């Protein structure tokens, strides 16, 4: 980033979707502390620029409700509630990692767990942002059958974010999985309509439709690359923009 990066910010309030898988590093389950701490340092870099930062965390590193129904024999709704609790565990892990480097944050849950964190209230969340705290949203939208991607779109819209960042393991949207298809084409930009028509499964249809209907762009980037988020916010970096 340049010395004048603070004056070159493209966005002032952003929503970052962090998948549960992004927190487990090379492990097959749970957390990788080094990975979480690296993410926290990247978040601090953005926070120190003066950007208001809201996170929505997934829970797939612990439990994935949509795919657990068959092997466990549980109802899908029950599975989704278990998944919401998994997102709470991830949110608290991130909060503790941020506190280690003196970054104030608040966990707000769509499901009331008052002994652990605050219940999500839109105005309260916005006030935390205005006070310079990172807001970490847990428990999705608080209802089963909705993904945390949909929660990210919803929170981004209702909290007035300029953009939704979708952190992945690659540096944008490709025509196919670049880890499996050597000649997969990477898009610098792609419209919501084209994304849906090509059935590129970056986010679920409900999330993409929400963002499209409210004209909020989605930026897909490599969350695992150190400093990538700050680079993009300051006008650089490698990513794909999904737009109307």
Swiss-Prot record:
Which residues does the record give as UMP binding sites?
59, 80, 141-148
Keywords, A to Z, come to: Allosteric enzyme, ATP-binding, Cytoplasm, Kinase, Nucleotide-binding, Pyrimidine biosynthesis, Transferase
Q: Which reaction does it catalyse?
A: UMP + ATP = UDP + ADP
Family annotation (Pfam families):
AA_kinase (PF00696)
Enzyme Commission numbers on file:
2.7.4.22
Q: Name one GO molecular function term.
A: ATP binding
Q: Where in the cell is it found?
A: Cytoplasm
Family matches, as HAMAP family: PyrH_B
Question: Record's family?
Answer: Belongs to the UMP kinase family.
Q: What does this protein do?
A: Catalyzes the reversible phosphorylation of UMP to UDP.
Q: This chain belongs to which protein, by name?
A: Uridylate kinase
Source organism per UniProt: Ehrlichia ruminantium (strain Gardel)
């Amino acid at each position: 980033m340049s010395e004048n990066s603070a004056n070159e910010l493209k966005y002032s309030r952003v929503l970052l979707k962090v998948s549960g898988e992004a927190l487990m590093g090379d492990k097959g389950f749970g957390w990788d502390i080094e990975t979480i701490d690296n993410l926290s340092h990247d978040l601090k870099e953005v926070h120190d620029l003066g950007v208001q930062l809201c996170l929505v965390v997934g829970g797939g590193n612990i439990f994935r409700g949509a795919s657990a129904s068959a092997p466990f024999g549980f109802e899908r709704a029950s599975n989704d509630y278990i998944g919401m609790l998994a997102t709470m565990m991830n949110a608290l892990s991130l909060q503790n990692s941020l506190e280690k480097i003196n970054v104030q944050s608040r966990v707000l849950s769509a499901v009331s767990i008052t002994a652990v964190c605050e219940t999500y209230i839109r105005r309260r969340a916005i006030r935390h942002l205005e006070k310079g705290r990172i807001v970490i949203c847990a428990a999705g939208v608080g209802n089963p059958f909705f993904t945390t991607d949909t929660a990210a779109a919803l929170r981004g819209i209702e909290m007035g974010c300029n953009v939704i960042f979708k952190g992945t393991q690659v540096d944008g949207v490709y025509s196919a999985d670049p880890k499996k298809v050597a000649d997969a084409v990477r898009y610098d930009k792609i419209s919501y309509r084209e994304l849906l028509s090509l059935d590129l499964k970056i986010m679920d249809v409900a999330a993409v439709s929400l963002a499209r209907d409210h004209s909020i762009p989605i930026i897909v980037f490599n969350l695992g690359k150190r400093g990538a988020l700050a680079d993009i916010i300051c006008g650089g970096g490698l990513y794909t923009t999904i737009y109307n």
